Amino acid sequence: MNVIVRTGNLFDSKAQALVNPVNCVGVMGKGLAKEFKIRFPEMFRDYADRCRRNEVFPGRPYLYRDLRGTFIVNFSTKNHWKSASRIEDIRDGLLYFIRRYEEWGILSAAFPALGCGNGGLEWDTVGPLMFQLLSQAKIPIEIYAPFGTPEYKLTYPFLCKKCFQRMNGLCRRGRLIWNLVMTT
């Protein structure tokens, strides 16, 4: 299995690329994004400039690289920092990542629980979606669940027991995921 789900500090990961949950207005004022801003000020300036130029959109993560070899995937989980995250934007962004990670040269990646915490989404919905979609990638992936997530919600049986639902409510375990990856 190429996906490991755990709790802990994303910044302790040995993955080549770290995923930063952002909004589209150039603010990294809370949560994990604020820590990214502190640790990577050049990345923050690049992100803020892209937001001013209206180049950051939900469902469309982008890769930031610097001369030191830092790989950060800025993953917009919502339009405005005051807004709630939408599961559709998480799904679309994961599919976009799956289509682009090879082109970006990413060999491994560590993801936070996208849209949870300040985004307002629940791990019970986000976790299975992330696990099932990111399992399509051919690289090692770490997913960091929210602190305090019960151990059983980090396991394969929990993450695969219920297929995430498409907007029309249809669900066909593994097959649905393959169709989403291939057609989106």
List PLM regions with ranges.
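Macrodomain-like recognition of ADP-ribose-binding/processing modules
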Residues: 1-184
